[in-house]
Amino acid sequence: ATFPHLAHLNVVLEVLYPALGIEVIPPPPITKKTIEIGVKLAPQNACFPMKVTLGNFIEGIEKGADTIFMAGGVGPCRFGYYGQIQRIIIEDLGYDVNFVLIDSPRYGWKNFFSSLKTMVGGKWSISRIHRAVRLAWNVLRYVEDLEKTSRLVRWKLKEPSQLDGLM
């Protein structure tokens, strides 16, 4: 399974998915090639993040991913529609992948757990999912704490760019 690079989401997903028994094939780091792929394939009026995440998916598929996980649903911007548009583009390109859109539990636990069931297939167990989600949540909190700390100390460094490789 692959997913897009969105902030530090990859760190969380690289913990969550193995805990759920899902093989992870992370896309390579975002490069000029990633951007070129997304710009070439996405609608011209699509925003830059949509193009980059599409490039992530194509590179993940080329590395062997047979499943794509993408957040979706409603939200404050067009982000909620990326997944639906990207699924159509990827299908039109002839890729045979399972595209799983994960809606926020904020808008309905039933859809959220339905997405999780699709992700884990026959390995469905409330306790397993609970442990995996709790682990991923803790990792997310630690990553956010690191991010906050890096912003607090960055200005004190002679070379603030020293933190760039860490965060």
Model regions and ranges:
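An N-terminal assembly and electron-transfer interface module characteristic of large anaerobic redox
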Residues: 1-167
